[in-house]
Amino acid sequence: MAADRAQNLQDTFLNHVRKTKTPLTIFLVNGVKLQGIVTWFDNFCLLLRRDGHSQLVYKHAISTIMPGAPIQLFEGGEDQPA
């Protein structure tokens, strides 16, 4: 059940930043920093676009994703129902 919730949060987050075209900074596990906008994603990878170029990034290589602006995924602020 926890795995389902984590997947749903991941999909909710990625879908939100894709729809709103929120700029992201993505850190890979090897320390590389990528920046851009998510244009597409699936269970294994995401497509990051910047300056007219696209990069296919495998999710297993991602350490951290930081939005360039505050986002609100759920109504009612930061508190989430269990």
Swiss-Prot record:
Top-rank taxon: Bacteria
GO CC list: cytosol
Keywords: RNA-binding, Stress response
PROSITE patterns recorded: SM
A Pfam family matched in the record: Hfq
Domain Sm stretches: 11-71
GO molecular function: RNA binding
Keyword Ligase: no
GO biological process per UniProt: regulation of DNA-templated transcription; regulation of RNA stability; regulation of translation, ncRNA-mediated
Oligomeric and partner information: Homohexamer.
Stated family: Belongs to the Hfq family.
Protein name as annotated: RNA-binding protein Hfq
Species in which this protein is naturally found: Bradyrhizobium diazoefficiens (strain JCM 10833 / BCRC 13528 / IAM 13628 / NBRC 14792 / USDA 110)
